[in-house]
């Protein structure tokens, strides 16, 4: 279930300030953020945002298809190492 239209999308204030400053300066350097819950807006297209996954910052390049999704969707928090092979073998 999505967020109410009258409320608008959530974006962290610090992230919004950094984006507006970079857009004004025509700067495209990497922005570090811990805000995985922030919604991707059209003004973010073309930026690289380093999203924290609990251990490190994962660089995410924002494209047009990502608009409306959350930043945390593109920085996985768990690593899948595969299923363990059957130890019994061929008895």
Swiss-Prot record:
SUPFAM superfamilies: Ribosomal protein S19. It comes from the Bacteria. InterPro entries: Ribosomal_uS19, Ribosomal_uS19_bac-type, Ribosomal_uS19_CS, Ribosomal_uS19_SF. It holds the Pfam family Ribosomal_S19. Keywords: Ribonucleoprotein, Ribosomal protein, RNA-binding, rRNA-binding. The keyword Phosphoprotein does not apply. PROSITE patterns: RIBOSOMAL_S19. The keyword Ribosomal protein applies. GO terms for cellular component: cytoplasm; small ribosomal subunit. NCBIfam families: rpsS_bact. Belongs to the universal ribosomal protein uS19 family. This is Small ribosomal subunit protein uS19. It comes from Prochlorococcus marinus (strain MIT 9313). The gene is rpsS.
